[in-house]
Swiss-Prot record:
Gene Ontology MF terms in the entry: RNA binding
Similarity comment: family membership: Belongs to the SmpB family.
HAMAP family, alphabetized: SmpB
Name of the protein this chain belongs to: SsrA-binding protein
Primary site of residence: cytoplasm
PANTHER family hit by this protein: SSRA-BINDING PROTEIN, TMRNA-BINDING COMPONENT OF TRANS-TRANSLATION TAGGING COMPLEX
Main function: Required for rescue of stalled ribosomes mediated by trans-translation. Binds to transfer-messenger RNA (tmRNA), required for stable association of tmRNA with ribosomes. tmRNA and SmpB together mimic tRNA shape, replacing the anticodon stem-loop with SmpB. tmRNA is encoded by the ssrA gene; the 2 termini fold to resemble tRNA(Ala) and it encodes a 'tag peptide', a short internal open reading frame. During trans-translation Ala-aminoacylated tmRNA acts like a tRNA, entering the A-site of stalled ribosomes, displacing the stalled mRNA.
tRNA processing listed as a keyword: no
Localization: Cytoplasm
Assigned keywords, A-Z: Cytoplasm, RNA-binding
Cysteine-cysteine disulfides: none
């Protein structure tokens, strides 16, 4: 009799996070978007080879695109496809969501950035956010509040 081999998959895992965005912006609203990817990109994402730093969302012809994100190709990638690490990737959002984001981005001071990329089942999802930039004194205040919360938790724990 053969024994069944149990393979554990991490389907709910985070692939990449944009910690810089959480530091530099006030997050107003979050959205979940799918991504249109090529085969070699999915293989690289399974290996966790993605960087969201310096990336943002652009809108062109009523569609949303992820610009500036890097997906590093694996060394074992297909030889007949030339991988481009910083390719602009189309985001899959509903027309209502695109309209909502586009209307807010056209207002002064608002921007749209990716926060995280993760697996949802067998699909790759991108968490994007409508954000407003922080000034230097806002960053200092946020850091001061975070330090106070940490100290308060440390005092309460004793």
């Amino acid at each position: 009799m053969s024994k069944a081999v149990v393979v554990k998959k991490n389907n709910g895992g985070t692939i990449a996070q944009n910690k810089r965005a959480r530091h530099d912006y006030f997050i107003e609203e979050k959205f979940e978007a799918g991504m249109s990817l090529q085969g070699w990109e999915v293989k690289s994402l399974r290996a966790g080879r993605m960087s969201l730093t310096e990336s943002y969302i652009i809108f062109k012809n009523g569609e949303a695109y992820l610009f500036g994100a890097q997906i590093q190709p694996l060394l074992t990638a297909s030889s007949h496809v030339v991988p481009e690490a910083t390719r602009t990737r189309k985001l899959l959002l509903s027309r209502r969501e695109i309209g909502q984001l586009l209307g807010a981005v056209n207002q002064k001071g608002y921007s749209c950035v990716p926060l995280a990329c993760y697996w949802k089942g067998h699909l790759v999802k991108l968490e994007i956010a409508l954000v407003k930039g922080k000034q230097l004194h806002d960053k200092r205040a946020t850091e001061k509040d975070r330090d106070w919360q940490r100290d308060k938790a440390r005092i309460m724990h004793k």
